[in-house]
Amino acid sequence: MDTVRLQCHICCSVGEIKNYFLQPVDAITILPIVELHTCRHQLCVMCVRKIAQRGRDKRVECPMCRRKNAHFNVYSVNRNSVDVLRCSVADVREHGRFGGLADAASLARGLFEPSLLEAEPAPDNSFGPNELQLVLKRLKAQIEAQTRTNYDLQLQATALERTIEEANDRLGKSRGDYSDACKLMDELRGDRLRAERAVKALADAHAQWADKNAKMRRENDRLTNENIGLIRDNNLFKQNTARKRKIAP
């Protein structure tokens, strides 16, 4: 992507960022949209200043989420380094006001005159052999670095896939073990219920036999008493018979 356009969600102003990847000279880029430090929502510095001016506690209330922010982040890109500046909302000041639209190039020329290049940069398509070699060298180095990164990512992805596969195998085994355990629990529960029913049946049978045994004991006692009475009566009968025989002439 050669150009990226960023828009402030409050004032709808647009900032354009060009890709200087193919430029032989290192370029410094300050991202035009800032990031609120607490809630991470983005807007432009002018909106930060205007919103902060309406408050009384030197903090800006985010228009998107209403969270208070005392700082905001500004991102700077230089070569292969991305730096972030944590700025205080209370320190934002309006530098000046113009009758029309402000000319950023003229403002930079006036404010940073000691940092101006003596010669204008060459047009985009007027690369010399040395510049082209430098660009190709950079491209080759970045391609090699990206290739190494891709290889490392591929190794990590392979290891991750293997780990996921092993985890899935363990999960499948755990599910099988859990299913077997559930089946065994069901079988044990069935055995316990059957054993409980058998014990209850035995208890009922024992109660029935105990009742019958008690009845038989009572009947045996009654018969024993009757037998004793009969024996006593028989003995008396024999005694009376013997006495009568003695008395008879």
From Swiss-Prot:
The entry's keywords: Metal-binding, Zinc, Zinc-finger
InterPro entries assigned to the protein according to its UniProt record, in alphabetical order: Znf_C3HC4_RING-type, Znf_RING, Znf_RING/FYVE/PHD, Znf_RING_CS
Disulfide bonds: none
Keyword Transmembrane helix set for record: no
Native organism taxonomy: Viruses, Viruses incertae sedis, Naldaviricetes, Lefavirales, Baculoviridae
GO molecular function: zinc ion binding
Name assigned to this protein: Zinc finger protein CG30
Keyword S-adenosyl-L-methionine: no
Pfam families in alphabetical order: zf-C3HC4 (PF00097)
Domain of life: Viruses
Zinc finger (RING-type): 8-66
